[in-house]
């Protein structure tokens, strides 16, 4: 005579219930939490950022929600990107995040490669449609860049200063109405801040956001395109470090 193990069905049901609750919780979260829901008609009419064209050995392509979600999720769960991005999401949430960007006009998710190997996740977004817009004199055609380099070895070898100028040059060429490229690293991310300053960005101060304090930078097409700095809330990273 076989005895039923009454514990197993209970555990199985409990596991399914937890999984379902997790899915519900994920579904209720904003898919694009930084996108502004109220913008002017002028800002709303501006299309999504263009796809930059890079010369070999670099390349950028649109991210595929179905094909790339697993890879991006694995990247974003690596310690250095958990710290920098705080997006250690499971693949299903990344799939929703990618699809929402592709379906809208706010941002575009991209995969960057070097010598044919995928190495970086990039988001180009319209800064005037983003939560950073109220923090400076945003122009409807400004474009922001977020980049997540997957391999820490590439980070340590200065990959960002090699990639960034190529992306910026292509964006300015393709979108002649874009006057500025925006960056908003965490105020503690000295590596990203040094890249911004190396590129010649204008520092627009540190600003408290909903979940973090960010350092805002603008890379203008020409010096005349730089937004006004106003009363800065902090010094550039180099000055902060040298004075401490």
From Swiss-Prot:
Residues given in the record as substrate binding sites: 146
EC number: 2.3.1.-
SUPFAM superfamilies: Acyl-CoA N-acyltransferases (Nat) (SSF55729)
Record's compositionally biased regions (Polar residues): 231-244
Pathway noted in the entry: Siderophore biosynthesis; mycobactin biosynthesis
PANTHER family hit by this protein: LYSINE N-ACYLTRANSFERASE C17G9.06C-RELATED (PTHR31438:SF1)
The family this protein is said to belong to: Belongs to the lysine N-acyltransferase MbtK family.
GO biological process: siderophore biosynthetic process
Keyword flag Transferase: yes
Quaternary organization: Monomer.
Top-rank lineage group of the source organism: Bacteria
Protein name, as recorded: Lysine N-acyltransferase MbtK
Lineage: Bacteria, Bacillati, Actinomycetota, Actinomycetes, Mycobacteriales
GO molecular function: N-acyltransferase activity
UniProt keyword terms in alphabetical order: Acyltransferase, Transferase
Catalytic site: 184
Its biological purpose: Acyltransferase required for the direct transfer of medium- to long-chain fatty acyl moieties from a carrier protein (MbtL) on to the epsilon-amino group of lysine residue in the mycobactin core.
Recorded coiled-coil stretches: none
InterPro entries the UniProt entry points to: Acyl_CoA_acyltransferase, Acyltransferase_MbtK/IucB-like
Region feature Disordered, mapped onto this chain: 224-244
Chaperone among keywords: no
């Amino acid at each position: 005579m076989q005895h039923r193990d009454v514990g197993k069905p209970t555990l199985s049901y409990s596991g399914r219930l937890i999984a379902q609750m997790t899915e519900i919780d994920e579904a209720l979260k904003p898919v694009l939490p930084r996108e502004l829901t109220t913008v002017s008609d002028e800002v709303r009419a501006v299309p999504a950022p263009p796809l930059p064209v890079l010369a070999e050995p670099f390349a950028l392509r649109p991210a595929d929600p179905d094909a790339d979600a697993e890879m991006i999720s694995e990247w974003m769960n690596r310690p250095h990107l958990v710290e920098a991005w705080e997006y250690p999401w499971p693949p299903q949430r990344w799939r929703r995040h990618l699809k929402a960007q592709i379906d809208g006009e706010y941002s575009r998710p991209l995969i960057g490669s070097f010598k044919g190997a995928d190495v970086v996740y990039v988001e180009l977004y319209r800064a005037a449609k983003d939560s950073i817009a109220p923090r400076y004199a945003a122009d409807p055609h400004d474009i922001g860049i977020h980049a997540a380099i997957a391999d820490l070895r590439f980070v340590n070898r200065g990959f960002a200063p090699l990639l960034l100028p190529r992306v910026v040059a292509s964006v300015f060429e393709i979108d002649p109405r874009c006057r500025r490229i925006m960056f908003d690293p965490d105020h503690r991310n000295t590596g990203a801040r040094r890249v911004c300053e190396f590129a010649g960005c204008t520092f627009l101060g540190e600003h408290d956001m909903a979940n973090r304090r960010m350092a805002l930078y603008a890379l203008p097409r020409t010096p005349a395109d730089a937004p006004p700095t106003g009363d800065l809330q902090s010094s550039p990273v180099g000055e902060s470090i040298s004075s401490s």
